[in-house]
A protein has these predicted regions:
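Conserved beta-strand hairpin/beta-sheet module of binuclear metal-dependent hydrolase folds
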Residues: 1-44, 137-147
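Conserved beta-strand segments of alpha/beta enzyme cores
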Residues: 2-4, 47, 74, 108, ...
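Short Gly/Pro-enriched turn/cap motifs at secondary-structure boundaries
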Residues: 6-7, 105-107, 127-129
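Active-site neighborhood of phospho(di)ester-bond hydrolases with catalytic His/Asp-centered motifs
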Residues: 27-28, 49-56, 75-78, 127-130, ...
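Active-site HxH/HxHxD metal-binding segment of metal-dependent hydrolases
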Residues: 32-117, 199-207
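Metallo-beta-lactamase
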Residues: 90-93, 115, 122-213
Length: 213
């Protein structure tokens, strides 16, 4: 499994290209700049097979429509965020008036415990509501593609549509219980490790319930 990282769009969203040994690829959170993603796939001699979305916000999905149209890749999104695919209020694209959002359709609606296979790579789907009701993390080998559930030293906000402060506490408690050798690839900012976040992230380094009060 090889991972390439692109930082895209107005909000500097991390888009991850995961490539199998056979040269097939999954793109996680194609934020914007579809041509840049396509050019990277071409450079890597990789064929896009699937688009995996950690949640439905526009800054993680802005290039989905074009990528799907040009490659035929299948789109995977949690069922509770499907309502965001064509609603610029719910996906908060309205906050960036200059952004031309293109609606798309999801081919596979995800739920907790689903397994997505790309050749030898298995992505396990864990629902981590809080930032949105349909937020998920994708686990593959020792990697967590975390979206906006957790960042280096922080976590995603909960004041947009379907955000839930109480649900976030429960999701973070689940993360805090995981083994520490996972590498976290977040939706924004630099990659980190679960060990580091348990030690230094205030949302994980103390009991989450106590921290939130």
């Amino acid at each position: 499994m090889e991972i390439r990282t692109l930082t895209l769009g107005e909000l500097d969203t991390n888009c991850y290209i995961v490539i199998s040994a056979a040269g097939n690829a999954a793109v996680i959170d194609p934020a914007d700049e579809a041509q840049k993603i396509l050019d990277t796939l071409k450079t890597e001699n990789a064929e896009l097979k699937m688009i995996l979305l950690t949640h439905g916000h526009f800054d993680h999905t802005g290039a989905v429509a074009q990528l799907k149209e040009e490659t035929g890749a299948k789109v995977y999104l949690h069922e509770k965020d499907e309502c965001m695919t064509d609603d610029t209020i719910k996906n908060v694209a309205y906050l960036c008036p200059g952004f031309e959002y293109k609606p798309y359709t999801a081919d596979k609606l995800l739920s907790e415990g689903d397994i997505i296979r790309l050749d030898e790579i298995e992505f396990s789907v864990i629902n981590t509501p809080g930032h949105t009701a349909g937020s998920v993390m994708f686990f593959a080998e020792n990697c967590i593609f975390a979206g906006d559930t957790i960042f280096e030293g922080s976590v995603g906000r909960t004041d947009f549509y379907s955000g839930d402060y109480t649900a976030q506490k429960k999701s973070l408690a689940r993360i805090a219980a995981l083994r520490e050798d996972y590498i976290i690839y977040p939706g924004h900012g630099i990659s980190t490790t679960l060990y580091q976040e348990k030690k230094f992230n205030p949302y994980l380094s103390v009991d989450p319930i106590s921290f939130f009060g």
